[in-house]
């Protein structure tokens, strides 16, 4: 015995040695993923009580998965080595435009917020599977020199969400509060006749602890 693993320890070729798969390079499943994201904003005071702010949030992702099964593995059982690559690219971003106005008139406080936002997502995927990798040390790299292509696939997913919102906050002496909100949201993933929805709202408040009794 030279210490090497006997791939078929019996006369039955279908009964392979599971320990063969611990040999480095015979079976590979490798994933690399990189992601860059951030949140950027700028704010400008247009006049007394009036401000404009823009928020931008980009999110970029790239990943690669490679799989390789050599001849001496339980999946292949002495046949032709196989390899698969899966490459994915994603770019998502959110942008918000916000206008706010706050003003006090003696005992009255008024706040107005206007918002427009959009979220966009773009996802791409490319896959390829081959049979008959000529040199096992190349694993899932250079799959173009394999003896045959088993499958090629691609995928593209894109969607957009858009929103508009207006909100008014009012209070009198901090005692009596009123908030009125109107929002309109739309999504490209909904049907042609149901892409948009309207969401109004009204809230009343009373700060009892501000009363004199």
Locations of regions flagged by a protein language model:
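Surface-exposed loop/turn segments flanking beta-strands in extracellular/periplasmic regions
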Residues: 1-22, 67-82, 124-152
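Outer-membrane beta-barrel transmembrane strands
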Residues: 20-59, 63-67, 84-104, 123-125, ...
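Short coil turns and loop connectors of transmembrane beta-barrels in diderm outer membranes
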Residues: 48, 106-108, 174, 200, ...
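Residue-level detector of the transmembrane beta-barrel scaffold of outer-membrane proteins
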Residues: 51-53, 109-113, 177-179, 201, ...
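Outer-membrane beta-barrel proteins
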Residues: 62-67, 108, 121-127, 189-193, ...
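Short, well-ordered amphipathic alpha-helices
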Residues: 96-100, 201-211
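Conserved short loop/turn motifs at secondary-structure junctions
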Residues: 184-188
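Outer-membrane beta-barrel domain signature, especially the mid-to-C-terminal portions
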Residues: 193, 199-201
